[in-house]
């Protein structure tokens, strides 16, 4: 009877109460149980008061109760019904897995952005290349046009400078036709006197007149020589005037150009006169004079060295950009584009 009553009384007790009674029978304190089980005193107190800590999972709580029961020598089978009530197994809340659609969407958006960036980059590179090619082609066409224009001007100048056919018909000197026969004695007397030859006049290269020997004889015979006839034999020859030779003075506005490679250029002075227009070969040089300021067009600035008023002209800005040089040289040597 006493055994059955004790069994019924144990069943009436909760799990926490049975663990507390067993601890007190063994003379253990909550602090001693907490130290042996490596638990907090508050956790041991919650177990004895049948409280389930909110921050403690049911699996851990059941494990702590079993360890406590073994410590106070209570069979685990007797505590199982109470464990189901005090610490029921709760289904773990599984957090829903985050879909990868967001990552895929972001990756797709990044892919479109990268594609658009590359497309813009290719368009910029293509436009830059097209602009450079058009500029280069325009410069080449301009140089070709200027060269053709120069060739046309040179050909027209050569056609205008062709020699005109000369009239070589012999003209009769009226002095020789009207000379009476008595002039023969005069010419005979002249043959005995020393003949003073006058210096031959300079021949103009622009004149293409040709004098025949017969005309030269007629002119010599027609020239009166009374002075030679009256000059005694021992007299000194008549003094002749000698043309004074003058050294040309260097023009302060002279434009000197030396060429290190083939180059096309055109030079115009202030009056609009073209001092030069055409091609200059390598190692050539030009020395031009005119009325300042000069206007220059140079197809290859790197191939020419210019000196104006004895000072070099800076063409570096045209050489760096590799373009046709257009500049004006004024009296103060300040080239302006």
UniProtKB/Swiss-Prot annotation:
Record topological domains on the Periplasmic side: 133-337
GO BP, sorted A to Z: regulation of cell shape
Membrane topology of this protein: Single-pass type II membrane protein
Pfam entry (one): HTH_25
DNA bind region: 30-49
Cytoplasmic side of membrane: 1-111
InterPro entries to which the protein is assigned, alphabetical: Bact_Cytoskel_RodZ (IPR050400), Cro/C1-type_HTH (IPR001387), Lambda_DNA-bd_dom_sf (IPR010982), RodZ (IPR023690), RodZ-like_C (IPR025194)
SUPFAM superfamilies from the UniProt entry: lambda repressor-like DNA-binding domains (SSF47413)
Keyword Membrane: yes
Chain segments annotated as transmembrane: 112-132
Tree of life domain: Bacteria
Stated role: Cytoskeletal protein that is involved in cell-shape control through regulation of the length of the long axis.
Protein name per UniProt: Cytoskeleton protein RodZ
Species: Escherichia coli O157:H7
């Amino acid at each position: 009877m006493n055994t059955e009553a004790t069994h019924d009384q144990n069943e009436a007790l909760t799990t926490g109460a049975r663990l507390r009674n067993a601890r007190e029978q063994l003379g253990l304190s909550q602090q001693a149980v907490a130290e042996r089980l490596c638990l907090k005193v508050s956790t041991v107190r919650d177990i004895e008061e049948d409280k389930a800590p909110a921050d403690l999972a049911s699996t851990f709580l059941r494990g702590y109760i079993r360890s406590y029961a073994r410590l106070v020598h209570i069979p685990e089978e007797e505590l199982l019904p109470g464990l189901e009530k005090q610490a029921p197994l709760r289904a773990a809340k599984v957090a829903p897995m985050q879909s990868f659609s967001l990552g895929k969407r972001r990756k797709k958006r990044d892919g479109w952005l990268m594609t658009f960036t590359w497309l813009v980059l290719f368009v910029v590179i293509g436009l830059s290349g097209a602009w450079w090619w058009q500029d280069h082609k325009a410069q080449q066409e301009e140089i070709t046009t200027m060269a053709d224009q120069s060739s046309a001007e040179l050909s027209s100048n050569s056609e205008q400078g062709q020699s005109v056919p000369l009239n070589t018909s012999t003209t009769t000197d009226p002095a020789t036709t009207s000379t009476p026969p008595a002039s023969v004695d005069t010419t005979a007397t002249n043959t005995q006197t020393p003949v003073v030859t006058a210096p031959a006049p300079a021949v103009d290269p622009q004149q293409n007149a040709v004098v025949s020997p017969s005309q030269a004889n007629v002119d010599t015979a027609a020239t009166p020589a009374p002075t030679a006839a009256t000059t005694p034999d021992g007299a000194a020859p008549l003094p002749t005037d000698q043309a004074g030779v003058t050294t040309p003075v260097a023009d302060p506005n002279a434009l000197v150009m030396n060429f290190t490679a083939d180059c096309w250029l055109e030079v115009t002075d202030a009056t609009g006169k073209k001092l030069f227009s055409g091609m200059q070969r390598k190692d050539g040089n030009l020395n031009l004079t005119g009325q300042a300021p000069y206007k220059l067009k140079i197809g290859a600035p790197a191939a020419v060295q210019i000196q104006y008023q004895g000072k070099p002209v800076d063409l570096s800005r045209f050489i760096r950009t590799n373009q046709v040089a257009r500049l004006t040289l004024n009296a103060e040597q300040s080239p302006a584009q």
